[in-house]
Amino acid sequence: MNFLPNGICFYLSVAICWFSSRVDASWWYMGTLGSQVMCDNIPGLINKQRQLCRQHPKVMQAIGAGIKNWIGECQHQFRTHRWNCNTMAREHNLFGRLLHRSSREAAFVYAISSAGMVYTLTRACSQGELENCSCDPGKKGSSRDAKGAFDWGGCSDHVDHAIKFTQVFIDAKERKERDARALMNLHNNRAGRKAVKRFMNLECKCHGVSGSCNVRTCWLAMADFRQTGDYLRKKYNNAIQVVMNQYGTGFTSAYRMLKRPNKNDLVYFEDSPDYCIWDHESGSVGTGGRVCNRTSRGTDSCEVMCCGRGYDTSRVSRTTKCECKFQWCCAVHCRDCQEEVDVHTCKTQS
């Protein structure tokens, strides 16, 4: 069975769509186009996505501005990993051929990007940047929690509105294809959307005499996106390799000893490459030139990161804060000091 996405890869422009391997324009170039021009000229969008793009230009602009945030979070989560969520400036799409393989890395990218769109749109709604959405209109009147009664007030983040739009827009093409890879993408998209909603916090303000809390006004707010990133990284670590069921309508675990995936799990079909060396077919850029930690025993160690090729050591000078003193009240003053440190970088393949 062929699990290649066959044109269902990432689309990244002002909106996060799904890239076709035939796209020649880079995503940041498309992001500079006007919304009408962008919607009419990006190849690979199906009619439903193109229609939504034209109808909601400000939404597309907000999504485009938020792309760097989820990419940055992806790169943070994998900063000590052989695959570090690197982007391909000279390729036809942002992640090169990585997304052609139905790997756990592809599963993570689909999930974190879907979560990133939900987070971006929810925040834009709460800040009044978009038409047709604002704070959550359902959070009115009174309610209770473990601390007692409170009144809804402030601006509760309307995450359900963002989830609905993200699902309709991103999933449109996958629902049209309905092949094995499309079902994988739909599953991981949903896991990403659900992850954002998992970290909604109840925040409250007290009202009363002398700071007492006789009356509380509360609202629901999204946690920092880092929590979503941390959660999805754990899901990546425990992602479940699956095969299609006999009816072609869902998944079952590839190995009997593994649990059946639930809606929160990430799923994938194909094993990942080792990402040690540059390989165009798999989308691996290799680890040559990557900084490694000589004393670590983790994934950032020179032994693991460099895949046994060895490493080079260079002496570099860096600026650090030193001789810090507390000054009443209330500041800390430090000097800038220069120190020489060893930096270890992986050798390239011979």
Curated annotation (Swiss-Prot):
Keyword annotations: Developmental protein, Disulfide bond, Extracellular matrix, Glycoprotein, Lipoprotein, Secreted, Signal, Wnt signaling pathway
Domain of life of the native organism: Eukaryota
InterPro entries tied to this protein: Wnt, Wnt2, Wnt_C, Wnt_CS
UniProt keyword Disulfide bond present: yes
Keyword Transferase in annotation: no
Family matches, as Pfam families: wnt
GO MF annotation terms: cytokine activity; frizzled binding
Signal peptide interval: 1-25
Covalent S-S links between cysteines: C74-C85, C125-C133, C135-C155, C204-C218, C206-C213, C276-C307, C292-C302, C306-C346, C322-C337, C324-C334, C329-C330
Gene Ontology CC: one annotated term: extracellular space
PROSITE patterns per the UniProt record, alphabetical: WNT1 (PS00246)
Residues of this chain annotated as glycosylated in UniProt: N132, N293
Lipidation (O-palmitoleoyl serine): S210
Localization per Swiss-Prot or TrEMBL: Secreted, Extracellular space, Extracellular matrix; Secreted
Biological process terms in GO annotation: canonical Wnt signaling pathway; cell fate commitment; cell migration involved in gastrulation; hepatocyte proliferation; liver development; neuron differentiation; swim bladder development
Role this protein plays: Ligand for members of the frizzled family of seven transmembrane receptors. Functions in the canonical Wnt signaling pathway that results in activation of transcription factors of the TCF/LEF family.
PANTHER family linked: PROTEIN WNT-2, WNT RELATED
Protein family: Belongs to the Wnt family.
Protein name stated in the entry: Protein Wnt-2
Naturally occurring in which organism (per UniProt): Danio rerio
Organism phylogeny: Eukaryota, Metazoa, Chordata, Craniata, Vertebrata
